[in-house]
């Protein structure tokens, strides 16, 4: 008969069968993974755009600071919250949050709406100041101010010659004294003319009267 007894157990400390272990994965280089992750995050930040109706915030690219400014919109007949949001490039939720509106039809309860608009403001790096230092903010604010165009005198067009408008002759102001003097002079001249005319008529009649007297 065959011996069916179990095989004797191996003694402790005895030789064990060597099991082949799975090969360990090669260590991941940290220097190569960090630039890839940074490039991936930067590309996601650039390609991520705001979709209409979403409440997700827009991630600004590196080296930029998001500034929120409000624009006043006058509500007119026929305006809709969707149309206003499309006009200014914002979401309806942002308009409702800024104006404390509960429904889309509440815009007609107000005469004007405050529209929040996000604008990106670049940061300046001069190698000495940090991003949040007051010096960099001062330089940044002065850099972002709109410069007025300077026009030299040579570029100015010559003034077009304009004919002076002929002004109507204003009547000469005459004082009361001058008026009375002129009136006296006219009366005096009229009197002299009448006297001269009377004398001439008398001289013409005198020869005719003398001839009648002698006849």
UniProtKB/Swiss-Prot annotation:
Q: Where is the composition biased (Pro residues)?
A: 157-169
Would you say which domain of life the source belongs to? Answer: Eukaryota
- The ranges of region (Disordered) come to 1-40, 135-176, 195-215
Q: Which InterPro entries match?
A: LYSM1-4, LysM_dom, LysM_dom_sf
Where is this chain compositionally biased, Acidic residues type? 145-156
Query: What UniProt keywords are attached to this protein's entry?
Result: Acetylation, Phosphoprotein
Q: SMART domains attached here?
A: LysM
Q: What Gene3D superfamilies would the database entry show?
A: LysM domain
Domain spans labelled LysM: 71-115
Residues where Phosphoserine is found: 5, 24, 33, 57
Compositionally biased residues, Basic and acidic residues? 196-205
A Pfam family of this chain:
LysM
Keyword Transmembrane helix listed? The answer is no
Keyword Cytoplasm assigned = no
N-acetylalanine-modified residues are 2
Q: Which PROSITE patterns match?
A: LYSM
Q: Write down the PANTHER family for this protein, in alphabetical order.
A: AND PUTATIVE PEPTIDOGLYCAN-BINDING DOMAIN-CONTAINING PROTEIN 2-RELATED, LYSM AND PUTATIVE PEPTIDOGLYCAN-BINDING DOMAIN-CONTAINING PROTEIN
Q: What is this protein called?
A: LysM and putative peptidoglycan-binding domain-containing protein 2
* Originating organism: Mus musculus
Kindly list the organism's lineage: Eukaryota, Metazoa, Chordata, Craniata, Vertebrata
